[in-house]
């Protein structure tokens, strides 16, 4: 059975999270964190995203991202895919870095993030 398509909207604001496979660490050191930030910057430029906030935990991350062009899935595929391609050889790994699909919640209230535990 195929996955349901994600609904994406023009100029939407999303709270996005993605976790490490088997809840393992995504970032092992500051070089990994910088690599991920560099990939995120390239995705923002390519997809015309605006990141309002981010939080990098050892085994997952949170993004608050605005997508003027309704292209969240394409950008997330790029972000997680390119980071995986760069991180795996560095750490002698193959396979998944991230667990399943990213989670995205459409932010439609001013106080959404205030109520969101991290």
Ranges and model annotations:
Residues 1-118:
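Short catalytic/metal-binding and nucleic-acid-binding patches
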């Amino acid at each position: 059975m195929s996955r349901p398509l994600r609904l994406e909207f023009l100029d939407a604001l999303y709270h996005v999270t993605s976790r490490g496979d088997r809840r393992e660490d995504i970032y092992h050191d500051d070089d990994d964190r910088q690599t991920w930030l560099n990939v995120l910057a390239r995705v923002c430029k390519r997809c015309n995203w605006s990141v309002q906030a981010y939080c990098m935990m050892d085994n997952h991350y949170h993004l608050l991202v605005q997508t003027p062009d309704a292209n969240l899935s394409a950008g997330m595929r790029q972000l997680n895919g390119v980071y995986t391609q760069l991180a795996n050889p560095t750490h002698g790994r193959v396979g998944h870095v991230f667990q399943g699909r990213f989670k995205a919640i459409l932010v439609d209230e001013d106080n959404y993030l205030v109520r969101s535990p991290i």
